[in-house]
Amino acid sequence: MKLTNSISPTNLDGEINKNSQPSNDNQQQQQPKINKIINKFSESINSVSKTIGKGIGDLTSSNALDEHIKNHNSNFIDPFYNEEAVVVVDDENIRSLIGDNCSSIGNIGVNGIEAFYGEHNNKKSELIKQFLKINSTNNKSNQTIVVDHMDYSVMERQSSSSSSSSSRSTGVSKLIPFLKRKEKIEILKDLSFYLKPGMMVLLLSEAGSGVSTLFKCLTNRIPKRGSINGDILFDNEPIDGESHHSQYLFVQQSDHHISTLTVKETLEFSIECQSNLSREAKKQLSSNILSILGISHVADTYIGNQSIRGISGGQKKRMTVAVELVKGAKAIMIDQATNGLDSTSAFELLNSIQMISKVSNVPALVSLLQPSPEIFSLFSHILMMKDGEITFFGEKHQIFDHFSDYGLECKDKQNPAEFLSSIYHQAQLDPDCQLKSSSDFIVAYKQSQYYKDCLIKISQERLSNHKFSGDKSIKIIENEKEQQQQEIYQLSLIKQIQLNLKRAFLTTIRDRASILSRVIKSSLLGLLIGTLFFQLDSSQKSANLLPSLSFFLLTFVVFGSLAGVGQVFSERPVFYDQKIGKYYKSIAYFFAGLVSDLIWNFIDVIIFCSISYWLIGLNHSADRFFFFLLAIYLLDCLVNRVSKMVSIYSPNAAIASTIAPLYFSLFLLMAGYLIHRNSIPIYWRWMHYISPFKWVFEAILSNQLHGQTFTCKSDELLPPIGYPLLNVSFPDGYSGSQVCPIIDGIEILKSKDINSDYSYKYYSVWIILSMYLLFSILSIIGLSNITFDNIISNKEKNNGNGNNNYNGKESINEESIKLSIKQHQQKQFESNEKCYLTFKNLTYKVLIKKKNHQKVSRTLLHDINGYVKPGSMVALIGSSGAGKSTLLDILANRKDQGIISGEILLNGKARDKCFNRYVAYVEQEDTLPDFQTVREAITFSALLRLPNDTMTHQDKLDTVDYILDVLELNSIANTLIGKVDHGITQEQRKRVNIAIEMASLPDILFLDEPTTGLTSVAAELIMQLIKRVALDGRSVICTIHQPSETIFKKFDSILLLTQGGFVAYFGELGPNCRTVLNYCSDLGFNCPQGKNPADFLLDFSASFNSASRLASNDKMIPSIRSRIKNVGNYCFDGSSNLNNKNEIKQQQTTTQNVNLGNEDKQQQQQEEANDDNNIQEATSSNSNNNNNNDIIDNYQFSNLNRDTIEIIDSGLPIGFISKTFKEKNATSFLFQFFMLLFRFFVCAIRRRNLIMTRIIRSILLSVVTGTLYLQLKNDQDGVMDRISFIFFTSTFASISCLSNIPTVFEDRFLFYHELNSNTYRHLSYILAMILADLPFTIMYSLLFSAPIYWIVGLQNDVDKFLFFIFVYYLYLQVLVSFSQLLGMVSPTLATANEITGISFSVFSLFAGFIIKKDDIPSYYKWLNYVSITRYLVEPLTVNEMTGSVSFHCEPHQLIPVPIHYTPTNATASEPTKLVFKSFCPITQGNQVLYQFDINDTDKFEDTFVLIGLFIGFLLLILIFSKILKFKK
């Protein structure tokens, strides 16, 4: 039976469906030339697509799919055609969809590709069948999507570079972004197209054309600042904001996954959240999807990130597809899902999508950058866009007719996909073409009959159903329950919370560094406080220490709970995606995180309190202990919740780390310890009552002091011994009488203005709980309503800052490149001194820990031999996970983990310290400076990496201009690079990355997938440039995915790797790839005519028994216990033979050779060989292969491999003089330092939001604190208020420096990359980083210290004022350096925050204020010298307490001393009389210094110590940042 529906005029093989009717009479006769082109390409890829379809045809032979097929049988009127189109889906139809003529691939033998693909596709057909059956309840067949005259625009703050900037844009508005005027920026304009059931639509465009924005509009992911005009209809209904997620599958460009979850765990979480299947069905679906996408072998591998080794980039992309396939078969939307995949994997992925689309009758819209002919054949329609508008939409065969009318014709042997991808570029080069500008293409399409037919069909579709009113504004239906026919969420709220809670626990447990730091922090601080305040008694000393102890507990909680900031930002992208996908409600995610935090916080607190409480010797009553535990726990939870709430509302971690300390600083100040309640001005007293620290401080004190009595030792009585008037007779003196100041706890409470009612402490519990509830509600509101989007319009549109212009001078072709070189940069680009790189017997092993905790030595690369000669290009190709990037890392000297054996020689010599000067490495992950412009980043690289002795400054700048020109970066040259989701596009980032490395004019250029993420035109241009580089005498080694035939033929040699890191071929490519194809042909593998040789070689590399090979990669490492047992058996068992002994010895040697420090980071692709039996079986299998060699053995024993080894061993050509460098770096230290200093300073200025936040924080705290201590009096309260004020300035500085850690942490990955490239010296970077921060630190310190000095009313002395602000700046600078040290040496941001909490707590505790130096136990005296805070408190105290300052007592501050004396008129009945004489404790500043054990000389000594600490931290940063590098 034939397929009667003519929705798609082409079949899977790209052939024109003769039954399809053109949309107008003028085009009923297809041009013979166009038909010839299409048919020629159809023939060229026929064998491949049909062979792949061979196995799929078996879908119809099984009864398992019968029920699914019946569900899709339907008759319907298709408004897109004038006649009735009857779709009858039966066995024959399915065969026609997937190809029923299964011809063999060439003339190949039993072991060839036909047998391989036959078995592979039979399995895949079964998997597709199972997938559709399992997900039958979630599938949505017969969907139709209509986009009718849709526009999309956003309101953006006026760009400083915008030509529309007026006089209103003042200097202030440039500094403060939110003061700029908003302007409307159009991103998408007048889009009209449709997606019908079963249609496969290929979306082709240039970078910056708004494709990703279009997908966001279709999936209802647009930001609130944007607006849509026009209609988007799904099944003739407008988008329903509540249920729209169930209408589509969307695979976006970015891969957002939690790095510490495995592939299987990530997929299972998605299945649980998005399906309502049975438990068994969910397991089958998980296994099914992993198998369809070819990632079953990495199911138990972590996803990974920049610091954690995990799956490869291509596997991450397939993981992104996997979590969407969970939804079932429905409208499919894919935004560049093949980036990072090899061509075979890309075809397999899209072929699976096409099967699902056709069999389930759902539409698919897929954007691709470099589609191969095989991939191109999968699509029925083409949608082309440029500058946010459509330049064509229609059937695949129609597009060639359309463009041929304007002089753009596809040549006979040209790939149609490449022709269409480069059509705008070709139009510029063709003088006969009538289309030049973007508007020409747009107008041409809108004047065509194809556009008119599209509008007619859209109108017919809309008229067929009158449910929609036709309003021109998009209608998002919110909360209309009567229109919801299904549940928005698949799971109940309880189940959602359970799943999120399980995931939260997994991610926390696997962050071992963070857990370890938390446990150590709680234990150490518990021991520290417990032993510092060890066994407090009833003395006056203990009475004075209790308030200090209570306050320190508050600071401990604050410093220890700020680590929650980093967690929010690491999980935010994943949460945003899953929130939009309706995985769970925001409240479920929140509650899961809340419960997780409550549990982990309790563990922290119980460790801390259990240790410290009993060591301190607080009240032994059980109820008092549990209340103490409760109070600390509630405060810890509240502080953690506030930190996370601030993070939810903050755009980045640096802002959150600035705002959160502001909150804590203010409310710590208002707690009632540093300044008593009655001393707080009435206008700030409200802050005292809403401060959570006030309630906990008072509760802890009240809990301990009620019922407590105190006594005095002789040296604690007042007036003290040695007081001049103590023994003077009354009334001039005290007649030797003394008094005990504090006799019970109630007196302490009253002195602190605390309610003495015992039940008062319970109020704090309810108030803290209320505050926790408030901040929880705010968190839920933020999670539900705030999304920091990444649509950046002004980089894509008006200013030309984001699209590839092919107009005028910016149109570059190969001839112009050659001309540009000859005229301008030939001298710079030609390499007079050549470099040879050889590698022999290169093997790479790592140690991993498997699921059963068995340690395994895994070989990732096996005996790799090869070389690269000057002027040649070597391609490293292989499937995903074959080890291409690993090999490139090793050759480029970027691997510092694992065990590398073999020989790598540069010009016949081992690599030395100058090796990286010869090479440049374009890494797969684009590590770029966020706050530099494109030109600045490239110029920075050129100026530092090009030698000054052979090139002038102008030569370097000319090189930069040339690279900008060739890579077509001029249009964005002055645009900030930004982050991945908030800057230039991914395609542009790739070109910038290549440009930065090219700027060094390397002798050997390593490139890891340089064309991934690029359009065909951009890829072609880049490879032209790279070829030109090679022709100028440089060596190029490049891994590449999905190369077009044109690009592939530019290489001179290839190194073909198989799964497991084996070599299948190394040698010349030959003219038209004949050399390598002849080699394959000799082995019985013939490349079909017209097939891309690169794709054929990838198929060839997979034609071996991978299971046995991969199993043999692993060698078990026996445990120490088993080794001892084996040795014992050998010693005592006479039957032990020499082989057993050798086996033990070999295992021991293997253990010694593996880096044991990277067990968790070295998880790789395969998880076979779970026990010794597997290895024995693999060994046996390999031994059997000797009689029937596979492609690996064939190459290993081939003449080609022997010839390669002979060439390597023969050494350098006779007379060759190797190029040598004497210095590791190309430029001097001073030049590097000033370049880095300038970059740091400029980038810091461009962080405007962060600068303004810190400025506001400094000014706000200065004003609030100053007015709180407004014009301090010289009474007794004024004495302690001065000391507490000085101490608070240190607390503010300590908390403020936390915001520096995220910035340093983010920048260090760029530092690692540039340091590996020998861009600069390690010392120059560290010095520049620290010194560049000096001006900003000075500014922040002055904004705080200068106003507050006079507001508080310290001594009216200019010298003392200048000393105050100078010492405060020094202290702040030291803390900044300390935070920079932690940012450089901590493995994670959470760990850095935990270490900061411990450090700042210790600094505050031992500064001499909370506990005086005399009261510090002898075994902790050294911590007083370690405390950085001491060196601020002491000099500022001396500065204030010396000079003309004096103090007095107000009447209520005098201490009455009882005196018994004999009056002159005494009688026998009353010989003595009791009187009271008032005592004023402090009248001079030196008394304060004496009490705190501070000397006048400390003022300057401590100042020099601060300077020394600054230098010391600088040295520590230099040392530890060189030793510790946290990379994969």
Swiss-Prot record:
Domain ABC transporter, first and last residues per copy: 167-412, 837-1085
The protein's name: ABC transporter G family member 16
Principal subcellular localisation of the protein: membrane
Domain ABC transmembrane type-2: residue ranges: 509-738, 1249-1479
Segments passing through the bilayer: 514-534, 545-565, 598-618, 625-645, 655-675, 763-783, 1225-1245, 1255-1272, 1285-1305, 1334-1354, 1361-1381, 1391-1411, 1504-1524
Sequence ranges of Polar residues compositional bias: 1-11
Comp. bias regions, Low complexity: 17-32, 1163-1189
Family assignment from sequence similarity: Belongs to the ABC transporter superfamily. ABCG family. PDR (TC 3.A.1.205) subfamily.
BP terms from Gene Ontology: aggregation involved in sorocarp development; culmination involved in sorocarp development; sorocarp morphogenesis
Membrane topology category: Multi-pass membrane protein
